A protein has these predicted regions:
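Acidic, low-complexity terminal tails and accessory targeting/binding regions
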Residues: 1-7, 52, 82-86, 92-107, ...
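Active-site-proximal alpha-helix that buttresses catalytic centers in soluble enzyme cores
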Residues: 3-86
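Active-site-adjacent alpha-helix immediately C-terminal to a catalytic or transition-state-stabilizing loop
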Residues: 5, 70, 139-171
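Cofactor-binding loop segments of dinucleotide-utilizing enzymes, especially the Rossmann-like FAD-
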Residues: 13, 89, 159
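Short glycine-/acidic-enriched loop or helix-start segments at secondary-structure transitions
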Residues: 20-21, 72-73, 96, 165-168
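Generic structural signal for well-ordered alpha-helical scaffold segments
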Residues: 47-54, 135, 139-147
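Short beta-strand scaffold positions
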Residues: 63-64, 136, 157-158
């Protein structure tokens, strides 16, 4: 009999809201990043995405634990009558100390830290993550689900930065 394929749909979370208002909170930049919510358009985007035929009849759904990823995954889960599972290995790359990152970026032409970290894959701030760190944990996740969910149809909701790092190694 024919062996069924394992299919993984890698989904980037929907659009987020710009939070440029006054912030009288004691949240650090990492906490702010993790709690970022979808915009009204992002909610609509996620709802529309969840109705995509490719994402029908899924066997399992995995998501980053960041709020924006879970907010995207909930629609896909609802349409498939499934719960979604969380894995920290799917988190966005941790930028870490923003002052250090600013120093690293000051003479760079791209103004895009994730782009620069792809060129210097081991660079990281004192409490941040390098592209290589991110690639390793994304691979841990991918290898595990390929083993545990063979012949399944899987949706994985993650982030542009970490997805980009994963794809560079896959290609």
């Amino acid at each position: 009999s024919k062996v069924k394929d394992t299919i993984i749909y890698l989904v980037r979370h929907a659009e987020t809201v710009d939070e440029n208002g006054i912030r009288n909170t004691n949240e650090d930049s990492q906490m702010i990043n993790e709690k970022e919510i979808l915009s009204v358009e992002g909610e609509e985007q996620a709802k529309k995405l969840s109705k995509n035929n490719e994402l029908k009849n899924l066997d399992i759904i995995w998501s980053s634990s960041y709020t924006r990823a879970k907010a995207t995954a909930k629609y896909i889960a609802y349409e498939n009558n499934l719960i979604f599972n969380l894995d920290n290995n799917l988190s966005e790359r941790k930028l870490g100390n923003l002052k250090e990152l600013g120093k690293f970026m000051k003479d760079k032409s791209t103004r895009d830290p994730s782009q620069e970290q792809l060129l210097d894959r081991n660079y990281k701030t004192s409490d941040g993550e390098s592209a290589e760190d991110t690639r390793k944990r994304m691979n841990i996740f991918l290898n595990r689900i390929l083993k545990e969910y063979e012949e399944n149809k899987i949706a994985v909701v993650s982030h542009r930065g970490s997805d980009k790092i994963l794809f560079i190694k896959l290609v």
